[in-house]
């Protein structure tokens, strides 16, 4: 056990602040301190914890001592059970749970029996929040994500014709989303078009489209290689025809693309849906990056999502939630907007965003 439970001394506030009960949080993750050389996965969980501690420091003037205790699961159910037998564990108001289903189940049962909130931010497909009132599911479940993205896109398609682009003999990996969107369009009597191309989209494949139209192109695949086979043809056709209004709609995976792919996404005024997004040039991002570098002497891993920012945003939500039941927080990378899943159930994070890559390298992030 790595103990970080010493309460941070609150800063002297500008105005009197009512002293609140201490907040105590257990962070239970596979830090793998038993390994001579920690794996990349273990290093990412350590980065998450470091970001979480920056959030603790940012909130230390709230009038309540904040206690954080880190427990290393070492990837073992036994270690989780061992932590629960520690009498000091009873002081915790909330648990940040690990990414293992068996370990989460043990902690969720403990939370239910002891009225302790269990925050699950790593197991996206876990469903324990549906039957356990103590579980807070940190990600919008996939089925609800597709529905929410589809409904939001339907509003944007009111004055645009959707054009679905697929490849002959190939199955796109977004068949479920595309099928749901087509069904919604059909139910509302909206027309859409299908274009199936052989190997690569050419401008000639689009010449049947009236040039005075307004089109939203929607690939049936999220793969970068497939996107690169589509965008140049759309750009060429648009530039030749001059008059059509053209935009592109896509998927969370696209937020990771860089180089020429990203340039073309900006060119085509691309919008994607995603549970999270980091605007690297935003002042808030720069501020956290600077604090992380100052505190720990290195930078966060260049990954998607960035675990240090996930830890920071998680702390910035969880601590105010424990203090005064704040149910929302729009973070640097991850937002938290919790809603109950029903009677006798826990809650889940309803946050979903549209990320718009506009011409001129402009990026806009808006909550759906």
Q: Residue ranges of each PLM-predicted region?
A:
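Sec-dependent signal peptide cleavage junction
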Residues: 1-23
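Periplasmic-binding protein-like
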Residues: 26-27, 90-100, 119-122, 161-168, ...
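Glycine- and acidic-residue-enriched helix-capping/strand-helix junction motifs
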Residues: 36-50, 171-175
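Signal peptide-proximal N-terminal region
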Residues: 45-68
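Short, well-structured alpha-helical segments in soluble
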Residues: 77-93, 204-212
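Extracytoplasmic ligand/sensor domains, especially the bilobed periplasmic-binding protein
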Residues: 96-166, 170-178
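Extracellular/periplasmic periplasmic-binding protein-like sensory domains
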Residues: 231-308
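Segments of small-molecule ligand-sensing domains
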Residues: 298-308, 312-367
């Amino acid at each position: 056990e790595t103990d970080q439970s010493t309460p941070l001394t609150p800063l002297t506030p500008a105005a009197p602040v009512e002293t609140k009960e201490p907040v105590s949080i257990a962070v239970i993750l596979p830090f793998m301190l038993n390994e001579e050389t920690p794996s990349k996965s273990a290093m990412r969980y350590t980065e998450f914890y470091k970001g979480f501690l920056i959030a603790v420091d940012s909130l230390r003037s709230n009038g309540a001592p904040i206690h954080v205790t880190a427990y290393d699961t070492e990837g073992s159910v036994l270690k989780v059970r061992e932590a629960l037998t520690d009498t000091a564990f009873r002081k915790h108001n909330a648990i940040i749970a690990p990414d293992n289903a068996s370990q989460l189940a043990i902690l969720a049962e403990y939370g239910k029996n002891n009225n302790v909130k269990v925050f699950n931010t790593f197991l996206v497909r876990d469903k324990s929040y549906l039957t356990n009132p103590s579980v807070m599911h940190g990600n919008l479940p996939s089925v609800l994500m597709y529905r929410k993205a589809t409904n939001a896109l339907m509003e944007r398609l009111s004055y645009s014709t959707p054009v679905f682009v697929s490849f002959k003999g190939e199955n796109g990996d977004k068949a479920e989303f595309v099928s749901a969107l087509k069904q919604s369009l059909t139910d509302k009597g909206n027309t859409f078009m299908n274009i199936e191309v052989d190997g690569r989209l050419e401008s000639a494949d689009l010449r049947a489209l009236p040039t005075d139209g307004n089109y939203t192109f929607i690939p049936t695949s999220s793969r970068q290689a497939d996107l690169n086979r589509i965008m140049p043809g759309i750009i060429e056709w648009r530039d030749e025809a001059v008059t059509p209004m053209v935009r592109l709609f896509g998927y969370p995976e696209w937020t990771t693309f860089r180089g020429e792919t990203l340039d073309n996404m900006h060119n085509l005024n691309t919008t994607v849906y995603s549970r999270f997004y980091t605007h690297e040039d935003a002042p808030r991002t720069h501020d956290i990056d600077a604090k992380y570098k100052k505190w720990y002497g290195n930078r966060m891993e260049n990954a998607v999502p960035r675990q240090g920012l996930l830890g920071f945003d998680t702390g910035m939500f969880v601590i105010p939630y424990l203090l005064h039941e704040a149910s929302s927080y729009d973070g640097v990378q991850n937002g938290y907007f919790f809603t109950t899943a029903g009677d006798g159930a826990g809650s889940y994070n309803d946050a979903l965003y549209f990320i718009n890559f506009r011409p001129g390298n402009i990026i806009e992030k808006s909550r759906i």
